[in-house]
């Protein structure tokens, strides 16, 4: 790794706040009492598969070799191990697409919940948002660069979820990836469809579907498939549904 200089802390913070308040009126969300929906949180725990258990052991063995200096840092390091661990925690097929799609996994549990909420919200055309920063769709970008013309389409969690939702009866036009809206005009059109209930499940990453996204009108549920690196990204995710302008009094 390389050492970096980073901001650490403020000095004389009380004095700084006094100066700042001479030109600014600061109110936090809890002081404003904005009309936002009540949020009910659910933690869905999935048991690891046998393949995942074995792979976790391999990650531990790799970490021991890295800490012991038995491997070249260019070949393996803790950043690579941590990245593989995040992928493995989401779905074993991200590591090896030939591994089986087993029932009860995190992705399959999420699909079940999406379908249940979709059916329950049919009358009001209620919508859902799925956040996933891992295994995002890259096929269109690759094709534009001429890299994926003759190769098999890579496995992604996004495609897997969409295929399963369609197989269970959800119309394809009601499912959208934020990655397909690659211009501001396309994003605006997509967001309008979500607010109108025409697109009822939208899947995206925190970077593309986080700050600045206003699709809250019919949002009834938000699914966090993975956990982002920065705590503030979770706040941005939550802010898409716990927001003024949501017609639902209670969301999940």
PLM region spans:
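Conserved RecA-like ASCE P-loop NTPase motor core of nucleic-acid helicases/translocases
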Residues: 126-134
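Conserved SF2 helicase motif VI
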Residues: 230-248
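Short, solvent-exposed loop/turn segments at secondary-structure junctions
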Residues: 25, 51-53, 61, 87-95, ...
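Inter-lobe coupling linker of SF2 helicases/translocases
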Residues: 1-100, 104, 116
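Conserved helicase motor "Helicase C" RecA-like lobe of SF1/SF2 P-loop NTPases
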Residues: 135-177
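A short beta-strand element within the Helicase C-terminal
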Residues: 214-227, 252
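Conserved helicase ATPase core of P-loop NTP-dependent helicases/translocases
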Residues: 162, 166, 171-206
């Amino acid at each position: 790794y390389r050492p970096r200089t980073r901001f650490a802390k403020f000095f004389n913070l009380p004095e700084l706040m006094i100066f700042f308040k001479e030109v600014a009126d600061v109110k936090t969300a809890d002081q404003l009492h904005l009309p936002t929906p009540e949020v009910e949180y659910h933690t869905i725990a999935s048991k690891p598969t046998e393949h995942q258990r074995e792979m976790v052991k391999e990650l531990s063995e790799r970490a021991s070799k890295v800490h012991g200096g038995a491997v070249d840092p260019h070949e393996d390091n803790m950043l690579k191990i941590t990245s593989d661990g995040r992928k493995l925690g989401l779905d074993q097929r991200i590591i090896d697409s030939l591994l089986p799609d087993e029932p009860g996994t995190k992705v399959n549990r999420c699909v079940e919940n999406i379908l249940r909420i979709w059916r329950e919200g049919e009358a009001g055309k209620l919508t859902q948002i799925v956040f996933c920063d891992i295994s995002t769709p890259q096929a269109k970008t690759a094709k534009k660069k001429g890299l994926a013309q003759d190769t098999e389409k890579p496995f992604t969690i996004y495609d897997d979820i969409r295929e399963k939702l369609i197989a269970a009866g959800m119309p394809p036009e009601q499912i959208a990836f934020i990655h397909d809206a690659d211009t501001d005009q396309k994003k605006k059109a997509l967001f309008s469809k979500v607010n109108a209930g025409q697109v009822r499940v939208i899947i995206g990453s925190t970077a593309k579907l986080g700050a600045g996204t206003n699709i809250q009108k019919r949002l009834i549920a938000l699914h966090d498939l993975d956990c982002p690196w920065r705590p503030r990204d979770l706040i941005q995710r939550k802010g898409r549904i716990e927001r003024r302008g949501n017609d639902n009094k209670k969301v999940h």
